[in-house]
Amino acid sequence: MFLECNPRFVSRLTRDTLALIMAGGRGGRLSNLTDWRTKPAVPFGGKFRLIDFPLSNCINSGIRRIEVLTQYKAHSLIQHIQRGWGFLRGEFGEFVELVPAQQRMDKPLWYAGTADAVYQNIDIIKAHNPSYVLVLAGDHVYKMDYGGMIARHAESGAAMTVGCVEVPRKRASAFGVMSVNEERQVLAFNEKPKDPTPMPGNPDRALVSMGIYVFDRDYLFQLLREDAENFDSSRDFGKDVIPNAIANHKVQAYPFSDPVSGQQAYWRDVGTVDAFFQANMELIGEDPELNLYDEEWPIWTYQAQLPPAKFIQGRDGRHGTAINSMVSGGDIIHGAEVRDSLLFSQVVVQPGATVHEAVILPDVRVGEGCRIRKAVIDEGCRIPAGTVIGEDPAEDRRRFFVTPKDVVLVTAEMLGQEVAHVR
C-alpha cells in the first residue's frame, strides 16, 4: 500500500481530483424538515449544516476543487456556501463552485437522477481536466480523509471505487447493498433491496455504500454516456451506473475505518427524523463518537456574528440552567431549565419553561411555562406560552408529526405561523 502511506503521492492525487457534491435532493424521509430547504442545508450539531461535513472533509483532505450540484429549494444552501465557503484562493486554482440545475438546449429538463446530474455537467468537469472525480453525497455526517481512498483506488487499478460501511441488516434496505470477494472487488450491488444480502459469516450485518465514489475521469464519462443512451435507465448511480460498471469493469470497495484503531469509523445517514434526532442527541454525551472539538480535523462552517449565550435569573428567583446540554451563540435561557438538549443559535427559552431531550433549531422562541420533551423544533418557531409538547401522544399526533420512535417534530406551519424567512 505504498501510495496510500506516502503523503507526497497522496497530495499529488488529491490535487488532481475534482470533487462533486450531490446537494440537489429533498430528502423526503426527513418529513417537514425539508419543506423549505434541501436536505444538505438542514442544520446539524448546534451550528453546522449537513453540507459542511463533506465540504470540510474535502478541505482537510487537500481537495480544493469542489463543485456543489444543487436543484431542490437551494436558496439557503447557496446563501450558506456563499457566506461561509469563500475563503479558497482562486489564483491558486482553488474553488467551491455552485452548479444549479440548468435547462440546456438539447435537454430542457431538470436532473433526472444522481447520474444525470453529473452527466449534464460533463462539460464543466472537462474544463477542470482532473485525473480523478470524487462523487460525494451532501447529506451524511462523518469525518473522512478522502486521500487514502483515492490512493487505494489509484493503486488497485480499478475503474471505480465505492466507499462502504457495515450496518445492521435490518436497516440496510435504505442503502445500496454490496457483495465483495476477499480482495474487496465488488461482485454485486443492489440499491435499496427489500431483502438485503448479509455479510458472509455475519447474518445480522450488511455491507452498504456510503454514496462516495472515485472514478477515473474518462471511465466516468464512458459510464455516463452509456447510461444516457439506455432508455430503461432511471439515471441513478446506485440503480443503474454501478451495476453496469460491475458487469464490465473492475469496481473496488473501500471500507471506511479509523486509521488508528482500524475499526469502522463514525458515519451517520440522518435521513429520517428519528436518525436526525438520535445523531444530534449523541453529541451532548460526555465522550461522543463524533468529536466536534478535534482541532486536527475541524468542521468549517459559516460563522454568524452573535453574542455569547446568556443565562438569566427569572423574576421568581429561578435560575436559567442548561444541564448535559449544548447551547449556541445568541441563546438566552431566562429562568428556565434546559436538560439533555441541543440548542442552535438565537434560541430564547422564557421563564418557567422546561426543555428536556430536545433539538431546538435556530431562532426559536419558547414561551413562558412551556414543557417540551423528546422533540425537534424547526427553525423560526414561536412556541406559545403554556404549550405542552411530548407528553400527550394523541394530542401530539393531532397537531404535529410524530415519528415511529415517538419524537415530535414541530414546524412553524403546524403552529399556524408564517414562514418568515428562507431557511
Swiss-Prot record:
Pathway stated in the Swiss-Prot or TrEMBL entry: Glycan biosynthesis; glycogen biosynthesis
SUPFAM superfamilies: Nucleotide-diphospho-sugar transferases, Trimeric LpxA-like enzymes
Reaction(s) this enzyme catalyzes, per UniProt: alpha-D-glucose 1-phosphate + ATP + H(+) = ADP-alpha-D-glucose + diphosphate
GO biological process, one term: glycogen biosynthetic process
Domain of life according to the entry: Bacteria
GO molecular function terms attached to this record: ATP binding; glucose-1-phosphate adenylyltransferase activity
Positions of alpha-D-glucose 1-phosphate binding: 111, 176, 191-192, 209
EC number of this enzyme: 2.7.7.27
CDD domains: ADP_Glucose_PP, LbH_G1P_AT_C
Pfam families linked to this entry: Hexapep_GlmU, NTP_transferase
Enzyme class, spelled out: transferase
InterPro entries, alphabetized: ADP-Glc_PPase, ADP_Glu_pyroP_CS, GlgC_bac, GlmU/GlgC-like_hexapep, NTP_transferase_dom, Nucleotide-diphossugar_trans, Trimer_LpxA-like_sf
Coiled coil residues, start to end: none
Alphabetic keyword roster: ATP-binding, Carbohydrate metabolism, Glycogen biosynthesis, Glycogen metabolism, Nucleotide-binding, Nucleotidyltransferase, Transferase
PANTHER family, A to Z: GLUCOSE-1-PHOSPHATE ADENYLYLTRANSFERASE, GLUCOSE-1-PHOSPHATE ADENYLYLTRANSFERASE-RELATED
UniProt function note: Involved in the biosynthesis of ADP-glucose, a building block required for the elongation reactions to produce glycogen. Catalyzes the reaction between ATP and alpha-D-glucose 1-phosphate (G1P) to produce pyrophosphate and ADP-Glc.
HAMAP family found in the cross-reference section: GlgC (MF_00624)
Subunit structure: Homotetramer.
Family of the protein in this entry: Belongs to the bacterial/plant glucose-1-phosphate adenylyltransferase family.
Protein name in the entry: Glucose-1-phosphate adenylyltransferase 1
Gene: glgC1
